[in-house]
Amino acid sequence: TSVAAAAKARSIFGPDARIMIDTYLSWDGPVTLEMSKRLAEFNIYWFEDVLTPDNLSGQAALRQPVKPTLISGGEHEFTHHGFAAIAKAGALDLWQPDITWCGGITAGRRILDIAREHSIPVAPHRGGEVWGLHLIVASDCMELAEKNPGNRGAPRDELWFGEPVVENSYIQPNDAPGFGVTLNEALL
């Protein structure tokens, strides 16, 4: 359960670690409110993707009742125009655009401009991949870089040479040209 997982994470990482819960669109409003109460003792930093991305008013309505936990999301929004609508609706406390899905670095910078205008923090979805990492280090994004090496059955770790690795919970992009990686052409 989410409660058991949060308890285990808190016991392993201690009182100061940020614990985030990604519900992947599986909660509704009442479940989010109930889980907020059940998880309160674990000081959850954010609930990610609690509702479907088009339910902006529902997300906005959850922000205050679940405080201090943040309502985050945005990986399923694919344009800066969509993030402008999220801002107008006051739907999310924290934005998580996915640079590979929202139009790349240029679109990501447009999204950051909108976020800055509304004082909304940004932590890119899959920010630990080279594209997200470069946006993080070249902007005022939060210094949080989600990295899931070797999961989902995808050969991502073999696709690129020079991909940064996590060391002691930190990740640094390398300083090679471009994004700092080279395509493994043997996989083509």
Feature locations, PLM:
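Metal-dependent enolase-superfamily TIM-barrel catalytic cores that perform enediolate-based chemistry
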Residues: 1-66
